[in-house]
């Protein structure tokens, strides 16, 4: 009961904002001056949900089939390279100019090259999504390691903590707030590339679902797909935020 009361106290304003958005849409859909095709009535969207609810989950799995491998690949590369650069001033001097140059290139601009060079569209999509995830996480890892308080390192030296144990017991925990911040930023931007990839080259995925029914002019189904996609992406972001809070509970004070 206390959790429910606390939830209401924290999010009642958010709930009012969502209600405001809902009633704004209801007003638009009932207004004769608004295109009924683009803004179908709410009951029509609800009916569309019922008609294609099983298809939603197939498309969700298709999206995760692209997102999860991309995330794993990007994390491995970002953590490995970020750790090396964070620990080695020489590597930072040599690689920083190259990384800054490459990282400013939007992944969407690389899509023609990825489509031509990759053996299939799925690998091209995974490359583009992973490319988009790597940079914020990489820079956050580097900054997290080079800004570690010297006290932690001195204590590790005193306790003779070295090698892999030093990495996982001292460096990564101390740098984790920065790493998580970069990762969450990466994931937010990744949804844009994920939807772009699905809209213009796959036959499965949440972005593909919305694009397909938009092309057909069935905007009630497109709205249903868009709302479902927003709901799923919101759950993913909340899950990462919860994982972040749990991992960094020793640094977070929300009281």
What are these regions (language model features)?
Residues 1-19, 238-255:
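Transmembrane alpha-helical segments of polytopic membrane transport and secretion proteins
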Residues 6, 30-72:
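Periplasmic/extracellular loop-to-transmembrane helix junction in inner-membrane transport proteins
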Residues 69-99:
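Transmembrane-helix boundary motif in ABC transporter permease subunits
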Residues 100-136, 143-144:
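Generic hydrophobic transmembrane alpha-helix motif, especially the helices
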Residues 127, 131, 164-197, 240:
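Transmembrane alpha-helices
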Residues 141-179:
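Short cytoplasmic-facing helical segments at TM-TM junctions of multi-pass membrane proteins
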Residues 146, 181, 223-255:
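C-terminal transmembrane helix and the adjacent membrane-cytosol boundary/short C-terminal tail
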Residues 182-231, 241:
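Non-cytoplasmic
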């Amino acid at each position: 009961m206390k959790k429910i009361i606390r939830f209401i106290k924290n999010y009642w304003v958010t709930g009012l904002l969502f209600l405001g958005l809902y009633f704004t849409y209801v007003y638009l859909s009932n207004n004769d001056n608004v295109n009924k095709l683009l803004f179908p009535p709410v009951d029509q969207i609800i009916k569309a949900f019922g008609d294609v609810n099983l298809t939603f989950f197939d498309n969700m799995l298709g999206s995760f089939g692209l997102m999860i491998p991309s995330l794993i690949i990007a994390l491995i590369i970002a953590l490995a390279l970020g750790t090396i650069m964070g620990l080695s001033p020489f590597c930072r001097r040599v690689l920083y100019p190259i990384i800054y140059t490459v990282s400013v290139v939007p992944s969407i601009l690389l899509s023609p090259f990825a489509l031509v060079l990759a053996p299939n569209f799925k690998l091209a999509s995974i490359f583009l999504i992973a490319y988009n995830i790597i940079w914020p996480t990489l820079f956050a890892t580097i900054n997290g390691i080079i800004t570690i308080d010297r006290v932690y390192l001195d204590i590790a030296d005193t306790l003779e903590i070295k090698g892999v144990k030093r990495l996982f017991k001292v460096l990564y925990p101390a740098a984790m707030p920065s790493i998580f911040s970069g990762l969450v930023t990466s994931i937010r931007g990744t949804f844009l590339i994920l939807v772009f990839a699905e809209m213009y080259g796959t036959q499965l995925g949440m972005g593909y679902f919305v694009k397909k029914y938009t092309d057909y002019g069935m905007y009630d189904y497109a709205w249903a797909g868009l709302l479902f996609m927003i709901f799923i992406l919101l759950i993913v972001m909340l899950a990462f935020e919860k994982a972040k809070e749990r991992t960094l509970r020793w640094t977070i004070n929300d009281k």
